[in-house]
Amino acid sequence: MHTYIYIYTVYIQMVAFSPYRIVLPFVAFVDLASFSSFRSYQAFLRPFLRPFRHQTCSSYFALDLDFASAFVVPAASFVESLLAYQAYSAYQACLAYPACLACQAS
C-alpha cells in the first residue's frame, strides 16, 4: 500500500506561503492508496501547482515527478520519500536561478 505521505509532507512545505497552506494539512491525512497510479496522483496535484507562477520552475518540478512516476508505484515507502526529496531539491535549485528570483520579486 502506498500512501505518498512523504511526498505530501514535502509538498506542504513547498506551498507553506500559498493560499493552500490551510487546506493541505488536512489533505495529508487522506489515504491515497486508492489512486491506481502515480499519473492519477499527478493529476490530483496539478491544480495545487498553480501558485508557482514561474513556468520554468513549475515545469522542472513536474518533469521530475514525471520521471519519478515510473519508480514510485512499485517502490517501497522509503524509496518514495527519496524520490520526493529529489523532486523538492530540484525545484529549490530551480528557484535559485536569477530568472526565478526576478519572477518571484514581481
Swiss-Prot record:
Q: Name one GO biological process term.
A: protein targeting to vacuole
Keywords annotated in UniProt: Membrane, Transmembrane, Transmembrane helix
Tell me, according to the record, the phenotype of the null mutant: Causes a vacuolar protein sorting defect.
Q: Where in the cell is it found?
A: Membrane
Q: Which domain of life is it from?
A: Eukaryota
Example GO CC term: the record gives: membrane
Miscellaneous notes: Partially overlaps SRP54. Disruption phenotypes caused by deletion of this gene may also be a result of a defect in its overlapping gene.
Q: What is this protein called?
A: Putative uncharacterized protein VPS69
- The organism is Saccharomyces cerevisiae (strain ATCC 204508 / S288c)
